[in-house]
């Protein structure tokens, strides 16, 4: 999020606009504010390669909090704003962050976490209440605007590109930090990754990008950062709402956006009058990733929006990247594309190459061993013995044309009576049922089979859960899937623990059923 040249060439062009309030920050303002925070971090002792963390909801200070690190040679970690104090403390401590930037809304959680963050020496709070300096911690808690207000608006003397230190989402275990080397290019010089993505996603100058997802996630960070580097305008939604999303496309003549499949599903389930009320003709490119998209959902979206949808697959660890446009997807329905970066190997449990069409663990050749920050055990587990390949545990296969299909995460594979079952297919089917808002499928203990297939469903609004709905959903699965893939029982929840990024926090659900058992899946 380095935009110095645009601040000079187009100082009054909107850099970003907050969707709810309409608050607009120009490129000149963004540049000045990012520089002020960079000066503050330097004055507090942070030098290149040091770390700080950002724990905020989407707000008008978020981008400059990232932008300051990107011009100071710092590693910054954007933390999921839905975490508890103990979860926040783990990431802040594990990342060795020296400064924590948070907001009034999340201050209580941050304050509870600070005693377990020994490296933190300063906590900056956006719109801090006057009584924010509580007695529960010795760490200074300072209002953000007050702290940066007296700092210079010009660049620091020793500008150097910084980079985010991303953490895996933690949906299958403890979050893991992915530390990347600082870029060697001078600030302002185009990065190879951004050139690659701008061509793939068809970005251009003066584009209008609508960002509906939390900014703490790696995908929105990359998309927003690329938009700012190119000189476009970002519309930031504080939280996703399907009707507001469509209204914003029309109001701002949005050209580009990035979504997740759950957002597609929520828009598709709107009444026809709501879906057809807004002019979406300005949209040029809609990118999606983060979670598997059910085939019927993708088909309906392409029919509605036209062939402007691009899908990609790439883990936070950035060890491989595939993509496909709408035409390629329609010719290979269900694919996540062909490899664009990284060399893919589909291997069985004995590390042998799987035949075409046969699922296996996805491994990627890497020039250096994948290293998780301060977690050597997990680093070894995710790398081949010789360090030449890495995996995040995804399972999939490649077809005759080289297109990749994801089957599931190996962590969630069900072994029932010796048969391997990947629950993603069953989840994708349940989600398109008109009475289902969301669904999770996983293995639960079975004395005879080891595990059996369980579905947990969030009913659609106005739908009554109970035995009748359970039978209807099981019958629906049996009509469309092989019997062994179908749930033997269905439980109901008011809300499933799905992250705003679209990923299902399935481990929380599954663990409830394994309290007194040992799962066959690691």
Show the residue positions of the predicted features.
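Gly/Ser/Thr-rich phosphate-binding loop
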Residues: 161-166, 229-230, 254-259, 270-332, ...
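AMP-dependent adenylate-forming
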Residues: 2-26, 130-133
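Conserved AMP-binding A3 loop
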Residues: 24-28, 163-191
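Structural core segment of the AMP-binding/adenylate-forming
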Residues: 43-44, 64-67, 71-147, 157
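Conserved AMP-binding/adenylate-forming core of the ANL superfamily
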Residues: 15-59, 63-67, 84-89
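Conserved AMP-binding/adenylation subdomain of ANL enzymes
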Residues: 186-212, 216-256, 270
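Conserved structural elements of the adenylate-forming
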Residues: 31-36, 149, 178-204, 265-269
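AMP-binding/adenylate-forming catalytic core of the ANL superfamily
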Residues: 83, 89-90, 100-102, 247, ...
